Amino acid sequence: FYLNPELTVTSVEMAGKNLLFRRDHQVIEVDQPIQQQEELTLTINYEGKISENICYTDVLTEDYLDTKVPQVFWRFGKRYAWLSNTFTLLTPECIWYPVTIAPVNPGAPYNVRKNFTDYTLTVHYEGDKTVLSQGKSKIDGPAITFTNATALPGISLTIADYDKKALRVDSTDYEIYYFKGHDYFSKYFEPLSDTLPGVIR
């Protein structure tokens, strides 16, 4: 498995039994043989912080600092994860949950394999901010569970002070989340209020 190196693995369990494992930075080797097409259910308990140094290791630092090559209209920053009381953002690139395929391939940066997975995420949060992730959400007290009907290559998590604009077209809900006080776009959609559902269809 691969996991952010700043996250400390406290135990790896199978059927209630602790398994031996070895940790080498982001690599976790579990001492449990597995046969071809065999299925195992493991519980990996971990805690800690997020190291952003593990993100996009295939991109050279000088490429980020090069201001003479007009790759895009703006410069990229060097922040890839946020964990604070006011804003949280975790993306698959920071390996905030265990994965079986490394997020980068230094030998062939454009040939990165993806492992599509049936993700279910439960977040325990008692604050007043909005919790978002991929999938359909269900709130049960302080727990918010996100379930997905299809396999995904990865999931993200964000918690922030968001406002929401929503529109239902037929049986599909469309939602836009934005930081409170940053609604600079709604006025441009007012002339389309009657025709927007038809445009979406």
Where does each model-flagged region fall?
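C-terminal beta-strand-rich structural cap/linker in extracellular carbohydrate-active enzymes
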Residues: 36-42, 149-162
